[in-house]
Amino acid sequence: SAYRLVKLWPSQLEYWNIFEMTINAMMLKEIKAAAIQIQEGELVGFPTETVYGLGADATSDDAVTKIFSTKGRPKFNPLIIHVTSIEEARQYGVFSKAALDIAHHFWPGPLTLILPRTTECSISWLATAGLSTIALRVPDHPIANELIKRADRPIAAPSANRSGKISPTRAEDVIE
């Protein structure tokens, strides 16, 4: 079946310095709409500080399956789970002292930590490819952070390109 992909970004985004960007009312309206799409199990294309991501509710098997289908990604290739904070990440991953020190130093930012899953982890096993580990990240991008916050759930988000293709760094390169 066909899946709807909502692309979340202002058309001028690539011209802005994302680290100085503030979210205006129009962007907030788009983010709220995209968060609802995430909650409804749909896919959303959104910017991070590195590449554009293809996001879905990380706790939903159906939503995660849509990511793999849309990208043509092998299901044995786990996804990165984007969260809002270290505190939230600790609900899903077991942090050693070293991992916690690294997270405090580099998050938010373009670092993914691979950690053992917590026993109460609610992330779809499909998102972690059935592994006992989980890839966690706290992005440093205002749109990504606001989307995760508004969706009120972790977002599984690989890059928004077909599997094996170059990761998109511009809005127009996101999966059609």
Annotate each predicted stretch with a short phrase.
Residues 21-176:
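Active-site-adjacent structural elements in enzyme catalytic cores
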